[in-house]
């Protein structure tokens, strides 16, 4: 398991966990959760890695190991979508070259 910090749309630091090699699958967790709770702890990420995929699991802002800014301006309605775009860009995930999976808040 690899963990790195990546800047969200406004520079907030987001923890991004990854495991495996192959076609990237970006996994977005649910509300009041984290990558550990939704994807790592239950083994979903490892199943994907074992099947030849690269599971990429950010902790969404204010969740898990990611920053939780106190400024309300850090949470516009489109914050999660903008963070996902920033992550894809930072990780060089080209449109059509990765799969996106969301659960609850991440959907």
Language-model regions, residue ranges each:
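Gly/Ala-rich beta-loop-alpha elbow adjacent to hydrolase catalytic centers
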Residues: 102-106
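Catalytic nucleophile-loop/oxyanion-hole region of alpha/beta-hydrolase
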Residues: 67-81
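Conserved alpha/beta-hydrolase
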Residues: 48-67
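Structural signature of beta-strand start/N-cap positions in the alpha/beta core
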Residues: 24, 54, 96-99
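A short loop-to-beta-strand scaffold at the N-terminal edge of the catalytic core in hydrolase folds
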Residues: 9-19
């Amino acid at each position: 398991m690899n963990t790195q910090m990546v800047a969200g749309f406004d520079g907030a630091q987001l923890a991004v966990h990854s495991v495996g090699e192959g076609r990237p699958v970006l996994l977005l967790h649910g509300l009041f959760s984290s990558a550990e709770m939704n994807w790592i702890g239950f083994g979903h990420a490892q199943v994907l890695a074992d099947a030849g995929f690269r599971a990429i699991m950010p902790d969404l802002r204010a969740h898990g190991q990611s920053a939780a800014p106190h400024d309300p301006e850090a949470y516009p309605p489109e914050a999660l979508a903008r963070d996902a775009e920033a992550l894809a860009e930072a990780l060089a995930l080209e449109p059509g070259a990765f799969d996106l999976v969301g659960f609850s808040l991440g959907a």
